[in-house]
Amino acid sequence: MINDIQKTAEGKMQRSVEVLKENLAKVRTGRAHTGLLDQVEVEYWGSMVPVSQVANVTLLDARTIGVKPFEGNMAAKVEKAIRDSNLGLNPAAVGDLIRVPMPMLTEERRKDLIKVVRGEAEEGRVSIRNVRRDANDHIKKLLKDKEISEDEARRGEEAVQKLTDKYITEADKLLTAKEEDLMAI
């Protein structure tokens, strides 16, 4: 029973860290990376699909992303989708290649983005702690119903706390890496 609670808690904590990683990837730094366009969708044959499914997304240099649609007639739609995404990007079509230059971040904008990133990280940590609380509540309920002993309950809570510490440390590492990325010029 305790093992099931631990496995469930670990899965939820892992998911919280994955969501944090996805949310941090959405925050634009001054450096180009192909993952920046993962959330951008374009209409293709009546349905919305990610840009990466209708175009080849590559890095042209450290500050420019190249997007080459598989079909030439998609270039205008892809360019419009990138421009309309709220990433603050200004793509320019050069033949069948769409160049997406990364604008420089001002010091003020960097500080604002760091605040956003710290908020995202705190949400991730809170999510992890909520999973811990739920797991501990479940363990306490089992103890109250006399399905487990006090020793098993204590060991279970200690194991859940170790998982919590592990995943909060992982979230903090993601935050530190993103902050360093934002402050790098």
Swiss-Prot record:
One of its GO terms (biological process) is translation. CDD domains: RRF. It holds the Pfam family RRF. InterPro entries: Ribosome_recyc_fac, Ribosome_recyc_fac_dom, RRF_sf. The keyword Protein biosynthesis applies. SUPFAM superfamilies: Ribosome recycling factor, RRF. One of its GO terms (molecular function) is ribosomal large subunit binding. Keywords: Cytoplasm, Protein biosynthesis. It is found in: Cytoplasm. The keyword Membrane does not apply. One of its GO terms (cellular component) is cytoplasm. HAMAP family: RRF. Belongs to the RRF family. NCBIfam families: frr. Responsible for the release of ribosomes from messenger RNA at the termination of protein biosynthesis. May increase the efficiency of translation by recycling ribosomes from one round of translation to another. This is Ribosome-recycling factor. The gene is frr.
